[in-house]
Amino acid sequence: MVKIATYHGVDPSEELARKAGIRPEDVIRLNANENPYGALDKVSAALVGQPLHLYPDPKQQKLRTALSEYVGQPVDRIIGGAGGDEIIDLLMRLFVEPGQTVLDCEPTFGMYSFAARLADAKIISAPRTNTWDIDIPAMTGAIDRLTRIIFLASPNNPTGNLLRERDARALLDTGVILCVDETYYEFSGNTLSHLLDDYENLVILRSFSKWAGIAGLRVGYAIGSATLISHLMDIKQPYNINIAGEAAVLAALEHRDELLERTRSLVEQRKKLEAVINDLDGVSYFPSQGNFLLCKFEHRTAEQAFTGLARHGIFVRQFPQTVLNDSLRISAGTPEQTDQLIYALKNIV
């Protein structure tokens, strides 16, 4: 057996509370880009009475039809997954053989490299510029005959910047499969899905975890060419979207206006945090189009800042032993959480 470095997710609130010596109800989770408002009551109500004793539809017909209306793409260009993570894994299974190459651009979402390691692929991470933009010469220079797929997030997690269309086109023109992860699309309002008509090697990945507040139900989806989606449908687990997840997505799409109002509120809280940080000495941030900010601390280490926030019950995301070891990613919260965060920041910087 081969030892694979584990991808570590976030701890539950009970574990965070134990580490901080506080009550679980006092934990403020700003470490996973979760939606602090949770699911709409109407979405939760939609789960009641579902036929949980039955297997879900392996063809995902209701789900894909509703998604088709939402994204403006034909049903045969859409597939649902048990979170975006499953679709990343399916793309690896479909395109990558052991020893072949997967390309990403660090710093970015760690699931791409984790899935590549599981596929026994070689992962190449091209460096970004000092403003976290894609370095196209570095990216294209890393592509060779063994390169099978490129993963780029837009907005990028954790830096928050967008993938420019001209950069996406430059990579797509190489002929290599490009997966653009638009998990935070509802916060940025920016998409490259209009390029799908021009490039059959483009895949758009999205999620309901962040904007819809149902991360615990694990539902994501991909948009691509009809041929590519057909192949993904062929290799997925037959019942990968559970009954509860499907019901929640259908209800979320029906009541999307209310959910999008919540996303706008979270963007406003991010902007409020930006304004406060602008006036703080010793901390700066990188402009973000997501529901989070990547903050850099100058007068103390990121570990010290993390510990200081944790003493206030606020948990954020660390990146030790990476190029971001001096930074923390802070998720947008409710107005009350933002106020507590600002108070804590002013006490630790």
Q: Where do the model's predicted regions map?
A:
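PLP-dependent aminotransferase-like
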Residues: 94-152
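Phosphate-binding glycine-rich loop
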Residues: 56, 60-101, 299
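Active-site phosphate-binding strand-loop segment of PLP-dependent enzymes
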Residues: 130-186
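N-terminal "arm"/small-domain region of PLP-dependent enzymes with the aminotransferase-like
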Residues: 1-54
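PLP-dependent aminotransferase class I/II
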Residues: 40, 201-279, 284-286
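Conserved PLP-binding catalytic core of the aspartate aminotransferase-like
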Residues: 266-267, 280-312, 328
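PLP-dependent enzyme catalytic core of the Aspartate aminotransferase-like
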Residues: 311-312, 317, 321-349
